[in-house]
Swiss-Prot record:
Annotated positions binding FAD: G15, A16, G17, L18, A19, G20
Organism: Nitratidesulfovibrio vulgaris (strain ATCC 29579 / DSM 644 / CCUG 34227 / NCIMB 8303 / VKM B-1760 / Hildenborough)
Primary location recorded for the protein, binned into one broad class: cytoplasm
Pfam families the record matches: GIDA
Protein name as it appears in the record: Methylenetetrahydrofolate--tRNA-(uracil-5-)-methyltransferase TrmFO
GO biological process: tRNA methylation; tRNA wobble uridine modification
Length: 474
């Protein structure tokens, strides 16, 4: 532990997104005077439009809320640690089956209100375009939480310190007006008719001819060209639908358009493909086209997506778009405490570190705030073990690999179970093991949970036969 970091009294945080807000609150509540810089509304990135803090730009879904999934497990850990993002998400959630989706405007408003009400935080709405900005000079620590859309000036300044930067594309799915959906074709329901999810999703069934026509149109559609200085590096979890389609004609049917578990009520048979629509808000006045992130030109989006059965008259509330995401090669440029190896006074948090996703970004900012708050108390906070969702995510940022890529929370980041178990038992076992390790870590690290820790019951694997665990599911 460095002596200078035991006397933190002031902090400057660049970026009031999910990670920045999480970190700011942790530090302010530990007695640190925090200046939180947010460039909106004076300047907006290509993907942002809401002046509120904590804006969600890619989707209104925070993905699965089931603790038998990597991201669901991470959410539970964050709830127990008192995450403001999870507080806001739970307060503004909209029906989405097993997923945690939110009303994005109410969500951002909730976070903004909490930040503005915190006496230890001064919110400055202006852009910080360089690490040499005079406003940063007096801060004991500087946190860059500018997100994947960090401004060009700040990105260049950071690149000068770390010796370079990496980037990839993130694509946004179109949103359509609910009243423009043809409900004589589109039907509501969940995969396998799971209870509690009825009506959370709308489903557009496709027969083989309809799918083939859509597929050919998608491949032929005109795309927004990349800028000369940008090389396309897609993250698998948010790949443009047209890029996915280029892998082969059946890729979509086995991926986002898989029809398994659905029956078309018009025919009584399983469709060849299913395209799902997910509610954007509580009133269900708008739906996003699930899995259809795209970089097609706007006119082409309208032409191609209106070929989907039931969407012939679709009114586009927001077109899909593509923006550049910026992140560092974390294992090379970051120390274990998320400080820059080249400048221990500067820390990174959120997606710019190489975590991927809303929840993961928030978790990263929350963790950094916890680490620095502990140092103020004169102690080092031990990292959760890699068997936990948070620990596994942090381990990803520390593990050198030849081609570092962003990752979301998934069981594949964790140590293998080392057991021969049936496939359906793997996720519950990963989850149960994670809960045991996390609760033990809370006690050993002296961290008091905000809510009672949840301990699931692991499946009985006595005498279980099945394939050995080789690759964990997310």
């Amino acid at each position: 532990m460095e002596d200078s970091l035991t006397t933190i009294t002031t902090a400057a945080i660049i970026g009031a997104g999910l990670a920045g807000c999480e970190c700011a609150l942790r530090l302010a509540r530990a007695g640190v005077r925090v200046t939180l810089f947010e460039m909106k509304p004076a300047a907006f990135s290509p993907a942002h439009s809401n002046p509120d803090l904590g804006e969600l730009v890619c989707s209104n879904s925070l993905r699965s809320d089931d603790i038998a999934s990597g991201v669901g497990l991470l959410k539970q850990e964050m709830r127990e640690l008192g995450s403001i993002v999870m507080e806001a998400a739970d307060a503004t959630r909209v029906p989405a089956g097993k997923a945690l989706a939110v009303d994005r405007d109410l969500f951002a408003r909730h976070i903004t209100a909490v930040i503005e009400a915190e006496p230890g935080i001064t919110l400055e709405r202006r852009e910080v375009a360089s690490l040499d900005d005079p406003a940063l000079a007096s801060a004991d620590v500087v946190v860059i939480a500018a997100g994947p859309l960090a401004s060009a000036g700040l990105s260049d300044s950071l690149a000068a310190v770390v010796g370079g930067q990496l980037y990839f594309y993130d694509a946004i799915a179109p949103i359509i007006a609910a009243e423009s959906i043809d409900l004589s074709i589109v039907f509501s329901g969940s995969r396998y008719g799971e209870p509690g999810e009825e009506g959370d999703y709308l489903n557009c069934p496709m027969n083989r001819d309809e799918y083939d026509a859509f597929y050919e149109a998608l491949l032929a559609a005109e795309k927004v060209p990349s800028r000369d200085f940008e090389k396309e590096l897609h993250f698998e979890g948010c790949m443009p639908i047209e890029a996915l389609a280029e892998r082969g004609p059946r890729t979509l049917v086995f991926g986002p358009f898989k029809p398994v578990g659905f029956t078309d009520p018009r025919t009584g048979t399983r469709p060849y493909a299913i395209i799902q629509l997910r509610a954007e808000n509580r009133n269900k006045t708008a739906f996003n086209i699930v899995g259809c992130q795209t970089k097609l030109k706007y006119a082409e989006q309208e032409r191609v997506f209106r070929m989907i059965p039931g969407l012939a008259g679709a009114e586009f509330v927001r077109h899909g778009s593509v923006h550049r995401n910026t992140y560092v090669n974390a294992p090379r440029v970051l120390a274990d405490d998320l400080s820059l190896r080249a400048d221990k006074r500067v820390f990174l948090a959120g997606q710019i570190t190489g975590v991927e996703g809303y929840v993961e970004s928030a978790a990263c900012g929350m963790w950094l705030g916890m680490v620095l708050a502990a140092r103020i108390q004169g102690r080092e906070l031990p990292t959760p073990p890699p068997q936990t969702a948070l620990g596994a995510l942090l381990m990803h940022l520390r593990t050198p690999v030849k081609n570092f890529q962003p990752s979301n929370a998934n069981f594949g980041l964790m140590p293998e179970l080392g057991l021969k178990v049936k496939k359906r038992e793997r996720k519950p076992l990963y989850s149960a093991r994670a809960r045991e390790h996390f609760v033990r870590w809370l006690a050993e690290a002296g961290v008091t949970p905000v809510i009672e820790p949840l301990l699931p019951t692991a499946p009985d694997t006595t005498g279980a036969a099945g394939e050995e665990t080789t690759q964990a599911e997310s």
